Amino acid sequence: MYQYHCLNPIAEVGLKNFNGNYAKTDKIEDADAVLVRSAVMHDMNLPEKLCVIGRAGAGVNNIPLGKCSEQGIAVFNTPGANANGVKELVIAGLLLASRDIVGGIHWVQSERQNEEIEKLAEKQKKQFAGGEIKGKKLGIIGLGAIGILVANAAVALGMEVYGYDPFISVEAAWKLSRDVHHTTDVNEIYRECDYITIHVPLMDSTKGMIGADAIALMKPSVVVLNFARGPLVDQKAIVEALKTNRIHKYVTDFPTTDLANLKNAIVIPHLGASTKESEDNCAVMAVKEIQDYLENGNIHNSVNYPNCDMGVCKDAMRVTIIHRNIPNMLTKFTAAFGDLGINIEKLTNVTRGEYGYVMIDLGNVADEEEIEKIRAIEGVLRVRTMK
């Protein structure tokens, strides 16, 4: 029996995927798995029993990845599960910024008691006029699950789309419209585009990537959109640019006091993935990843360990080992099982950065005392068994 703990409310449609071998617990110290959305885990004590954390969403900056990796805890996210919800809000952001829809709505509300509002609207509507996005240049920084959907939707709306992503995968590239101009120079996007939207993960290398230097290259008429992570855009630089009309507008899903007090900032209360469909998709995906890991040892969409899949074990026992990526580890594992007289039927070893992951299917069952000898090998972080 496996136990799971939810740090945030998780969509019931996802939790229903847990079968009778799973039970919900209110105590994290009893949990084999944790499901989380936005709860900050950095100051939490992670119990020894905990094997896996499933993030029902894409960003993992609320999870202590270093601590998890050292404790042998696999961390999964759900890339693409909320992509359509975010894409739709980005398109809405483009439209809100191109025409003063927000200002027009506020004006109507201010005149709601005026019996002449219908006639007055015809006189006042000019102040809320704007332009169309068709034919305008949209620059997309980051062509992952969300960036690709935004690019393809913008092409369908008649925009001239530029994409920048030096790390785009082959799989992602196949999904991208052939009408997207792929640039290898992000500065081309800063210089040429009328709208710029950012869709990259928050890392040390991307924090503040849209700052004073990038803004200096942009057109004064540019609209910058950020539905990825707040700190990707330098707060001080963007506020100064808005105050001095160095850029036209900033549309963001991450409210701050400074931005909320600027008329040329359109600030949304983090609604990007706040759709029922997104929450359901993320929950279902996270639960399935957790199940496959706990029951079969397979890793998909881990952010701290390498992906690895050997399907369902058809031999006597499966052993999985999380270890440091140092020389001779695989030799030590195979030698140890050989010394124990246990035959290895199948084996996969993959690495990612400082860590490695081994899946071994055995011809006969190893008892706990024999497994302890594997755990005792220097460099081993966690050993799990399943039948």
Regions found by a protein language model. Name each.
Residues 87-106, 152-159, 285-298, 334-338:
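Oxidoreductase and adenylate-handling cofactor-binding alpha/beta cores
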Residues 1-78, 211-213, 217, 223, ...:
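An N-terminal-biased, well-structured beta-alpha scaffold segment characteristic
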Residues 79-137, 301-303:
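Phosphate-binding beta-alpha-beta segment of Rossmann-like dinucleotide-binding domains, i.e.
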Residues 212, 220-313, 357, 361, ...:
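Rossmann-like dinucleotide-binding domain for NAD(H)/NADP(H)
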Residues 39-44, 166-258, 274:
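Rossmann-like adenosine-cofactor binding region
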Residues 143-144:
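Glycine-rich Rossmann-fold phosphate-binding loop(s) that bind the pyrophosphate
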